[in-house]
């Protein structure tokens, strides 16, 4: 075939260098290492700061491998190569949608390259090493590249494997392997990033944050584990699992190609007719791209340099949902690598400083810890500007309170009901067996194999349960027969994630969360008996029973929350606004005559807007009715504000003697009797303190009070909204078990691989294009340009149609829910059901119900607070004795 002709090289041009000095538009990311930023500022002579080539090489060699080579001469392609090249070019042109790229691809089809024979592993597995661009090779520090134990191809070649099998069949026996296992390295920590269609900014935020965390681990000075038995970086593997070629953002692939873990044009659609299920790339890199499209590379021997990071990139050919991505992670890659701890991250979640180390330390110091999670907080933007948006502010407050009250309480019991898939960790040997088996029942790709036990054989309740599959995994882990695994919350580990900023997106997200958590919560309660088969101690079992009772109480309160919010609001309006002997015949705030009238109009509006929610929710199109939803948010928020003002007025009036005053003059007993009277303001005061007061006290104790100042207003005003809009929409769409994502199975643009027999007719091989290094470097420059260009937000896609059978179940569920809440309301407030109740007047029944609701609310809040205090004290003690 011949060798390529010599080609000219030239020095970097200033105009080209300046092209990469830009930063992307703001995208909620405003922080990165000062050290790394300084490296970029003082190295601006080329796209990578300075040429990557080894300074020891000659000038000619240096010129030959800069990023600005013109490329080799053009040749004609051989006949057998034309179709393959055309397929590759079609994929690249479709991926980029860029005229210049398409023209370059057509020019590339005219080149005539040599070929090489690639023997298939065990005659069926295609696994090939491809040279990486010279710039990436020479970015590796000499101390790693030239080390005695270094493998020659680890830093010079990217490994590609076409997996034509199910994840369960990705085994050593079938000829599949991974580099860390080939190099006989122990994998202590496997960090997995699952991806659907996130843009390159979100992906870079997560990946760069992970690499910074790995640097924190490698730079540990005093460690009992990481500094023994080989370099720390060799014990860590980062695995990216992308859910399908078609939904994948092609700019994100350019970012991965820039750091060396991906190359365009090497994927094969099938091997001898066997369809490729996943494309697996492997490389060890020291490069990273920041969310602001800045390239980070090593500089000398500074401690701020990123260490080598072993990466596995799994690009699934078809979109088959997140749970299938986890099956590739746990059943394919983890079985070969056998890691001790697996950390799960979603693309877009940025781990905080030393957060991954804190998660790992929790497992290292507690041998019975099966799973853990860190604190997830909302991304608020530069200067916390996003808290101006009430939806973002409310979610920020919700996340914070969950991390201060709920997670510590559950951690104290040993069973955290949900370890969020966006930021959690598991001990691999703890989830092996039944936990993973039950977890993967929700994988659509296993439906034929599992039959009735699979997703196609499930009823609608179980399908909703798998919208919160991480809750199922948590329960199965704690209930694992014969073991005593427990779950924990790690306060020192923090992750930042973006949250929905629009009403339609927020409603769709909460539909999945609420329905999934409700179904999974019932599942855990109904299968609680399996806890007795576990190996937990008697003390742990006792506390698990207490937690189960707490969860049952919370579930009941959630079910009847629709009636509770209505009754609470109407009772407070009547107590303050309707003149009576209890308030000394003073109607407030509109006067004796106007206050009852205004309150009635508020109530009628409440019922009308609530009815509107059912009508809109049954339409299943929140994006199509944005304005009515926004107006509904506004109305319920105003009602909540009005009720809060009346509540505080009620309490203040009780203290100053203006209305329903407390008796301070006749002893403690009389005061307590007046304070806890069902017609007094004492119970309202207890309810207010048990919610708002505990939120403030707990936040101060955890030294994280800022959300109280910046975000509490949105959360408190939106409490009614969360029930009347979000829960109504969720239950009315119980039949919809989709994730709201639209998958695609398109991969026609990829070329196929056809095997041939050697002369002895024994060994199967394929003929592969053998590109010269110069061409690889030339094409790489265009990739870098695409990777470092500003990000453009893609347009959103529409929803999907729903099944009629699921609509029927949905209708029955909604009717049952509404009827039960309506029945409670009628029994409490109606005047014609005296004989059915314990009292003879509706006023007495209403006061009694009001008192019970407030006491239960106060009790649950106090219970969460006690658990939070216990966790805080225990964490302080363990912090003094923990090991690394």
Curated annotation (Swiss-Prot):
Disruption phenotype: Reduces drastically spore production and leads to strong retarded radial growth rates. Increases the resistance to echinocandins. Leads to resistance to AFP, a small, basic and cysteine-rich peptide that exerts extremely potent antifungal activity by inhibitiing cell wall chitin biosynthesis. Residues 37-48, 84-93 have a biased composition (Polar residues). The keyword Ribonucleoprotein does not apply. SUPFAM superfamilies: Nucleotide-diphospho-sugar transferases (SSF53448). Residues 1-58, 73-108 are annotated as: Disordered. One of its GO terms (biological process) is cell wall organization. Residues 95-105 have a biased composition (Basic and acidic residues). One of its GO terms (cellular component) is plasma membrane. GO terms for molecular function: chitin synthase activity. The chain crosses the membrane at residues 513-532, 556-576, 597-617, 635-655, 681-701, 708-728, 812-832, 852-872. It catalyses: [(1->4)-N-acetyl-beta-D-glucosaminyl](n) + UDP-N-acetyl-alpha-D-glucosamine = [(1->4)-N-acetyl-beta-D-glucosaminyl](n+1) + UDP + H(+). It comes from the Eukaryota. Its EC number is 2.4.1.16. The keyword DNA-binding does not apply. It is a multi-pass membrane protein. Glycans are attached at residues 44, 301, 840. It is found in: Cell membrane. Disulfide bonds: none annotated. Keywords: Cell membrane, Cell wall biogenesis/degradation, Glycoprotein, Glycosyltransferase, Membrane, Transferase, Transmembrane, Transmembrane helix. Coiled coil: none annotated. CDD domains: Chitin_synth_C (cd04190). Belongs to the chitin synthase family. Class III subfamily. Polymerizes chitin, a structural polymer of the cell wall and septum, by transferring the sugar moiety of UDP-GlcNAc to the non-reducing end of the growing chitin polymer. Plays an important role in septal growth or maintenance. Mediates colony spore formation. ChsE and chsD seem to play a functionally redundant role in lateral cell wall chitin synthesis. Involved in resistance to echinocandins. This is Chitin synthase E.
